[in-house]
Every structure is written in structure tokens, then in C-alpha cells.
């Protein structure tokens, strides 16, 4: 170096700051991990980003840009031809924690990690010099993500001489290009020492040749018009100062041919390798101010996708702290058939959606009347006079209403009259078709809810539920009382098999609708009863599904999510609720082995006989014999009493 070079003025070096570009896919993945995996754990997570090596200057690459996307969470996923940077994610749990955390101390802690890693390395390993950290808070309800990226930078007192010598660039650029192309991995050669042996140029990153000066090549990630290198160079310069270099030439290599050389001199008087250097590195905003950024994805994500994620949000939050072992997937996967689209059907459907159930089918043959909307939340006033003043069909309208509430639900409404025992068949073709449709619906669904108005309408679904081994839940209302129960399963031990809706009856169900006054035909109940019964019916299902035995669970067994009772009876007049157990009855008109076997043998023919004559069913299941034995026992009791004429008058 000439004397004029040695005495040239020294100026403080300038660098192009690094910025970040965080794609929406990064936050989408972060929200998924936060909800399902991280939960309340705010431990630091390893991630990675990348910087491209552009070949043409444009407004997007005039400064080095760290890119973060979906693949940043997969350490193994790395694209070729990019400079990959390792990093750490620190996702806090509250916005207050994000705001109040001491950013200076946090950057210092991160900088110490880089400093420790740097002074312990003996090579120019790219990963030791380039690290980033990102502090985040995820507002999963509003899809807002607060974040601040830091690139910890170690500062050493290097100065740039006012003299430039581009002869190094002209002399070595072609050789550097060839070496980079032959290496095929620009990441490994991001910073390397240039040396020559017999006129040939070599790049070495495995060791630093002992010297007070040297020539190094820095592969720059930006194409800024000014002759300023990226700020990433500062950590390499600190490393050289730590290793004893006082005078270095750096060739800042760029892909577009605009490479340049900078000569650096160390102020040895102010550099102390035994003292941790000043650490900087928080990214500035586009206005040049220090501060975090906000990514609001609410306006970018498809509303249907937003709704789908939001439906599951509160459910998954249960697993964070309250019920970590709750199996939500098994609930979500259930295909549910609701027999009845009235008051109970409406409330049960809403509660099922709240639990994330996506497949719900309604069966009902009624139309919406003016008295319905106030008690049945899936209907509105306009539904009462639609379809030429007849009112909408309940099943179809209920299915539409669910889709209006949540477009991601698969909901269907089927207008169907369920064949009822005690109501003789008047049109066999139609009744048989209805039976076939109902039977197919049972095959296509996992869960059956019996929510109809009349007692006899539940008989055939009860038989089908046992024959097809389905989970059947029954909900029935009185004026100020309710019953919620689950039916048993034929695979349960007979001595402990749960009873069904009809197991306490000594007569077969019959016509309860004919010759009834208005107050007897309408469901006259206190309005709150339906909500209570519906909620319990859905919560009972969830408890059943959490039990390893499912519908085979014995009465009142418990799971990690609570009990699994057989029956729940509630009474509003004294605001009491009772759990009951009723074993199966061997002569039950719906679930006895005799009835189920006969149904499996004859199918529709058996059903038709029962519909036309409930007495036939009583003979098949044995209730007729029970009734006869009871009558005979009564007669025998009367004979044994041997009343005289004076005592017999009170029997009249």
C-alpha cells in the first residue's frame, strides 16, 4: 500500500440494513401451531428464513430481505440458490407481555448467543454469523399478528479509508464467479478468505490464515446502487477483529456485476476483545422508526376459511389448560341424524355445531307455523308464510339455516313421515318407501337423536338404532320436566345392558294423537325446558364419545371429561335434576332380543304388522303374556281376600 493510502482519511463505514418480509402463510402456520401444539408454552422455537441472491436491481432487492413463509417452521425444507439463515421464534401469550417485555434486554440476550457462538468458531461457517430472532404475539380471535424481527449485530471499530482500489475486483471477479459456480452452494461461501497459489485464486472458509491483514469475499444479498455492503458483514468484521486482523480488503461480490472493494482498518486503541461489544439489530419500520409491525390477516383470509378456523378456536382452547386430553376430532367426525327439526332439533343442532360437528341431517315432515320462530331458533317470521302461505318445510329450512350460520357445515333436510306404531298403514307403497329411506339414513349416520313430539314416533327409530348398532340419544319434554337418556347396546352384558325409552312400559306404544284437544296436541312446556334438555343431550353425547367403550359404556361410568349417565331427569317446579339408571327389560317392545331378531328376519313385513296392530307386537315381545299373568294374579288376589257382602260395596 502506498504512503498516500496509509495516510488517507478514515470514515465510519455505512451499511444497508436488512429488512424482513413475512408472508401470510407464515402466520397461518404459526396460528395452527399455537392453537394445536404450542398452546401456553412460550419456549423459543427453531425456525429458518432465507435471503435471495438477486441478479437484477429492482425496488424489491435494493436492500437484503429476510423472507419467512410456511416452510420456515420445517428445518429440513430449504430451497437451493438461497442464503438460509437460522433463527428463533419467541411467541408470547398476551399482548401485554409483548408490549412490556424489555426489548433492549431481550436483544442483548440474543446478541450474547451470537457473540458466544462467534468467538468459539474457528471457521467462517455461515450459520455461526447469521442469526435472526422474531418476537411475536398471535391474536387468534382477530387474526392479528404483532411481530418484531431482530438481527443481532456485533459492532467493532472498523473504519473505511477514503482510497478505493478496484484492481482487486477486476483481478478476481471472474475467478470468484467460477469458484462460486463450481461450489454450487453460495451459503457455504457467503464469506470466505481469498488467497492465491501459483497464480490461481482460492476461497477458503475452513480456516483463517494467520495474518494481520488479508483479502476476503463477502457475497452480498442486495443490489443497492450505493457502494454499501449489507449489515450482515459487520459480524464477520467483528470476528476478524477478534482474531487479530487490523487491516483487511473485502470484495463485496454481487451477482449483477456491480461488485466493489472496500478497505477496512481497525481502530486498535478502542477495540478490546475481552469486552462484549455493543449489540444492535432491531428492525426499523418503513418510516425508519424502531417499533414492531402488525399483520392483520382478517381482511386477507377467505371469510369461509376464517369461519372454519374460528369455529374450532374455542374448542381447541379447552385443550390448553382445562381439558388437555379432550378428543375433539372424534366429535367433529360424527355424522349426526336429528329426527325432529322443531324446538329440540333446533337447539340440539346449534349445540352440535358449537362442538364442531360438521355433518347434520334433519328429518321432519312438518311446516313452519307462526308459533314456531320464538321457540325454534333456526326459523324466522318470513319462513311462516313462504311457499304460497303454507310455511317452509321445517327440515329443509333448518338445514339452510345451519349453512347461513356456518357455511362449512354439511347439512341436509329431508321431509319424511316416520312410520308410527299404532297408526295403521293407509298407503303401503309410501310407508314402505319412508321406511327404506329412514333405514338408509341410519346406515349413513353414526349418531341418532330422537326429538319428535309423540311417543309412538320413536318406536321404529329405537328398533333401527339397536339393529344397526348406533348411538341413540333420546330427549323428551313435559310441562316443567325433561328426560335425556342414551339407549343401550346389544353387545353389552345382558345383566347390565341399559334400557331404552320403552323399557318401563308394560304395553306397546299406541296412537296418542287422535281425539286430542289443542293443548294435548301441541307441545305445551315451559320455554326453558327445551334449551336445558337439548344442551344435556349434546353434552351427554360428547361424554359418551370420550369414553373408550363409547355406547357400550356401563351406566354412570366416568371419563376424563366427566360422567356418562344413563338417564338425566330434570324438574323445574323444584329446580332439581336426577341421574337414574334403568336396566333393559327382557319383554321390551322396542329393544328386546325377540323384537330385534324378528325385525332382522322380516324387515318391513314385521314393521307393517306392528304398525297395523300394536297387539301383535305385544304378543311377539311377551308383554301380552305379562299382562295376562298380571290379570290372573289380580283375580287370584281378589279370590283370596274372600270379601263378605258388607265389605264388597266399596269395590263397586
Curated annotation (Swiss-Prot):
Keywords: Autophagy, Cytoplasm, Protein transport, Transport, Ubl conjugation pathway. A motif (GXGXXG motif) lies at residues 340-345. The active site is at residue 522. GO terms for molecular function: Atg12 activating enzyme activity; Atg8 activating enzyme activity; identical protein binding. GO terms for cellular component: cytosol; extrinsic component of phagophore assembly site membrane. It holds the Pfam family ThiF. GO terms for biological process: autophagosome assembly; autophagy of mitochondrion; cellular response to nitrogen starvation; cytoplasm to vacuole targeting by the Cvt pathway; piecemeal microautophagy of the nucleus; protein modification by small protein conjugation. It is found in: Cytoplasm; Preautophagosomal structure. SUPFAM superfamilies: Activating enzymes of the ubiquitin-like proteins. The GxGxxG motif is important for the function, possibly through binding with ATP. Belongs to the ATG7 family. E1-like activating enzyme involved in the 2 ubiquitin-like systems required for cytoplasm to vacuole transport (Cvt) and autophagy. Activates ATG12 for its conjugation with ATG5 and ATG8 for its conjugation with phosphatidylethanolamine. Both systems are needed for the ATG8 association to Cvt vesicles and autophagosomes membranes. Autophagy is essential for maintenance of amino acid levels and protein synthesis under nitrogen starvation. Homodimer. This is Ubiquitin-like modifier-activating enzyme ATG7. It comes from Scheffersomyces stipitis (strain ATCC 58785 / CBS 6054 / NBRC 10063 / NRRL Y-11545) (Yeast).
